[in-house]
């Protein structure tokens, strides 16, 4: 697991013109929706939510474009690795907590870390 953030050199970045056009002139956001067949996961008895968290983490970590962000000074850069963030609802107080689980390439390692973090989050241990 790493937490490195590498600044992008705007002077040499081939996508600078596109970045500036959208960041300065046409600020926007985007979202994506796809149909996804999860039959295999259901047949295996996998828990859908952590499986989807893992899949999103895997895809995001494959593509530099999904790991881009701005630093405190507003300069663009790329994270070496992203980790998953999700919420857990507390029925007794009708509140929720935001949890973070480190991304692991190995699904079994990720799911074990997720279960650990979820148990801590549900018990108020985080």
Segments and roles (model prediction):
Residues 63-71, 123-126:
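Short secondary-structure capping/junction motifs at helix and strand boundaries
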Residues 90-126:
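Helical lid/core segments from catalytic subdomains that handle acyl or acyl-like groups
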Residues 1-47:
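N-terminal beta-alpha "docking/capping" segments at the starts of catalytic domains
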Residues 66-100:
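Small-residue-rich loop/turn and linker elements
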Residues 40-64:
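Acyl activation and transfer enzymes in specialized metabolism, enriched
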Residues 37-41, 59, 89-93:
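Generic structural motif
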Residues 32-34, 41, 84-88, 101, ...:
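Generic structural hydrophobic/aromatic packing signal, biased to beta-strands
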């Amino acid at each position: 697991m790493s937490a490195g953030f590498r600044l992008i050199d705007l002077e040499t970045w081939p996508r600078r013109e596109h970045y500036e056009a959208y960041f300065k002139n046409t600020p926007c956001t985007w979202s994506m929706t796809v149909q996804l067949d999860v039959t295999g996961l259901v047949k295996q008895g996998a828990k859908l939510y952590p499986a989807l968290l893992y899949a999103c983490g895997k895809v995001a970590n494959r593509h530099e474009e999904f790991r881009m962000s701005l630093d405190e000074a507003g300069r663009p850069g790329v994270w070496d690795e992203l980790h998953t963030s999700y919420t857990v609802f507390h029925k007794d107080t009708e509140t929720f907590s935001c949890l973070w689980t480190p991304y692991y390439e190995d699904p079994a390692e990720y799911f074990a870390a997720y279960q650990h973090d979820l148990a801590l989050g549900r018990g108020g241990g985080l």
